[in-house]
Structures are given as C-alpha cells and as structure tokens.
C-alpha cells in the first residue's frame, strides 16, 4: 500500500531568498503567516486592502506588523467595497453585533459581518501583486467567513 504525504507548505533553505506575498489584514492569522514566511527566509511583500471597513484599526495593525517584520514592501490598496453593501463592516446602516461569545452557537445563516466575496476579491488582488513582484508564494490567513 502506498502512502502519500501532502506538504501544505514548503519552506526554502534560509540562504535562498525567495519572495512571498502575504495578504496582511492586521489580524492574528495573517500576521502569523507573514512571520512564518519571514522566519523561513522569504523576502516578504505585504498587501493590505482598505476596502472601506469600519475598523480602521485593522489598517494600523497591518502597518505595525509590516514594520515589525521589516517586510520588503507594504502596499495598502484602496478598493472601496461600500457600494456593494450587504455587510455591517461596510454599511453604516447595518449594526455590528456586539458581545458575542466564542462558545455561543453560530447561526445557520451568513452573519451580517460577511462582506460578499471579500476573500475572493482580496485573493485576486494578491495574485496580481504576487505576479508583479515575481513572488514564489502567496500567503493568506483566514479564520472565518
């Protein structure tokens, strides 16, 4: 019987400078991916998307992470998703839920904080940035919708 191992991530030798683009939101997941790639010897290029979100603290956090990791380039790309609507994160007429606990059951429907196709849009932009920078790796950290 044959056993196959799948490597989800292949690091390069530290003496070889490969390029990585990280979609850097400022959150824990993308910061971890950026740090991981940097630690593994990649020259990291960070892309942060300013999509008109309410929480500009995310943009500040992304800048702090990029600075702390001394990324090669940190591009903040303004792509206004507010006209798309349908999300509490971009539409001021929709209230952002407060006080949810991690152990509470999640509703069967999509949360009001979901931004339609946001990650798909972001990945398309990151792929374009990665291709332009001749990156070998594209990193993203996602933990929810």
PLM-predicted stretches and their roles:
Residues 1-9:
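N-terminal amphipathic/basic-hydrophobic helices that include classical n-h-c signal peptides
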Residues 9-145:
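ATP-dependent adenylation/nucleotidyltransferase module used to activate substrates
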């Amino acid at each position: 019987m044959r056993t196959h191992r799948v490597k989800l991530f292949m690091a390069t030798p530290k003496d070889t400078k490969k390029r990585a683009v990280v979609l850097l939101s400022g959150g824990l997941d993308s910061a971890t991916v950026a740090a991981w790639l940097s630690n593994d010897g990649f020259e990291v290029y960070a892309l942060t998307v300013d999509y008109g979100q309410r929480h500009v603290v995310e943009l500040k956090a992304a800048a702090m992470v990029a600075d702390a990791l001394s990324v090669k380039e940190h591009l903040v790309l303004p792509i206004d998703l507010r006209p798309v609507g349908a999300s509490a994160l971009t539409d001021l007429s929709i209230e952002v839920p407060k006080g949810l606990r991690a152990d509470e059951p999640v509703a069967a429907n999509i949360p009001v904080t979901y931004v339609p196709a946001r990650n798909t849009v972001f990945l398309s932009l990151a792929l374009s940035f990665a291709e332009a920078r001749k990156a070998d790796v594209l990193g993203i950290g996602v933990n929810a919708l």
